[in-house]
Amino acid sequence: MKAFFLGICIFVSGLDAFSQRNEEKVQRLRFCGYRYKDTALLRRQFEQQLAFLQVRDGDTIVDVGTSSGAYIGAINVIAGFKNVHFILLDIDIGCLNRSKVNNMIAHYEALRGSPFNNSISFVVNSIDSLWLPLNSQKRMWMFNTLHEIPDKAGIIRQMATVLQPGGELIIAELLATEKRKIHGGCKKPLVTGVELKEWLAAGGFDFKDMIANPIPVKKIKNPYCLFRFIKR
């Protein structure tokens, strides 16, 4: 497969994206991922996750499998941290491109009512490389993505090479149960917590802690969990 590398494209929130905050126009903005329109609902969905993520002022965080970065946009609506740099990383140029990332920023800055306090850039990766320097990052996230990747050992190995020793990797997944072993959206097999810990241990990570079901819904068909791992 041909490797697409677009480099890092930096967007400073609050300029052209925020100028599109007119509500009617924002409704038409196209991007991939979450499209929350209610701040109260967004807060209920993300505040427990934010507490677990422990983002600090000045952090740089790589979001692997980000699509158009909507998770990052959503948490920036309610977050209190400042001067955090988010690197969006995905293989799908149909979702991760300048237009859709700017649309995502415009949507969530309009919902927030002001520009983000943080910066966002993106990197389009390939199957065999994240296109980030070795041992360059301290923090990395992967949300609802690992179950979709055929070569799980390969992507874990790639993330390990980019993270510094002692670096943190947070992985979120809907976990398989006896009754529900397939993801309802992508129709790919879900993983179990045991499998996840085994794969990460083999890839050079130690399990630290986790949080289960941080999303307040009445009925969760599969447990949604965030796992924190530390690179050895």
Task: Name what the model sees in each region.
Residues 62-130:
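Class I SAM-dependent methyltransferase SAM/SAH-binding core
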Residues 50-56, 78, 130:
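Glycine-rich helix-loop-beta junction characteristic of Rossmann-like nucleotide cofactor-binding loops
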Residues 20-53:
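Class I SAM-dependent methyltransferase Rossmann-like catalytic core
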Residues 137-152:
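A short SAM/SAH-binding and catalytic strip from SAM-dependent methyltransferases
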Residues 59, 84, 167:
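Glycine-centered, small-residue-biased loops immediately flanking beta-strands
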Residues 153-168:
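A short glycine-rich, Lys/Arg-flanked "PGG" loop and its adjoining helix->strand segment in the class I
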Residues 1-21:
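Bacterial Sec-dependent N-terminal signal peptides
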